[in-house]
UniProtKB/Swiss-Prot annotation:
Name by which UniProt lists this protein: Protein NrdI
Entry similarity comment: Belongs to the NrdI family.
SUPFAM superfamilies: Flavoproteins
Gene expressing this chain: nrdI
Entry superkingdom: Bacteria
Organism listed in the record: Streptococcus pyogenes serotype M2 (strain MGAS10270)
GO molecular function: FMN binding
InterPro entries, per database record: Flavoprotein-like_sf (IPR029039), RNR_Ib_NrdI_bac (IPR020852), RNR_NrdI (IPR004465)
Length: 162
């Protein structure tokens, strides 16, 4: 089976870091500072959302993640995205995931709130196992994975122009 890891970003609050630790899966953290990270294996990206809420989607994807994904080698290894957010921010809940999914043409696999629940951990572990099993069959089977949007506050994303 092909190698698969988790690549994630977590600010100094460490919310995403704590979630990733609960997964017990091989992981690499995108640095908070400007140090570059380059990956040479397939990965699932776990990313928090930094939008202000309402219709303000500006800044939803952390700058460090944008810098990481601006590297073509890093982009080509991404097999899917999982995002976190805060439902208090309404329409921008976990918005970084759909943005990255659309730009990279990879599946949005799951969204969770804040630190995630035990159910979120189990779902992400199952997604990881399923994707790892299917990675050798290339992108064709990755696209067949079911996208999960589990939070009742999640609404379809509106098109915003920048």
């Amino acid at each position: 089976m092909a190698e698969l890891i988790i690549v994630y970003f977590s600010s100094k609050s460490n919310n995403t870091h704590r979630f990733v630790q609960k997964l017990g899966l091989p992981a690499q953290r995108i640095p908070v500072d400007n140090r570059p990270l380059e990956v040479s294996t397939h990965y699932l990206l776990i990313v928090p959302t930094y939008a202000a809420g309402g219709s303000d989607a500006k800044g939803a994807v952390p700058k460090q993640v944008i810098r990481f994904l601006n590297n073509p080698n890093n982009r080509k290894h991404c097999k899917g995205v999982i995002s976190s957010g805060n439902t208090n921010f309404g329409d921008t809940f976990a918005l970084a995931g759909p943005i990255i999914s659309r730009k990279l043409q990879v599946p949005l696999l799951h969204q969770f709130e804040l630190l995630g629940t035990a159910t979120d951990v189990k779902k992400v572990q199952a997604i990881f196992a399923r994707l790892k099993h299917h990675t050798h069959d290339k992108q064709k089977q990755t696209n067949n994975l079911i996208t999960e949007r589990t939070h009742p506050c999640h609404k379809p994303m509106r098109h915003t122009s920048h």
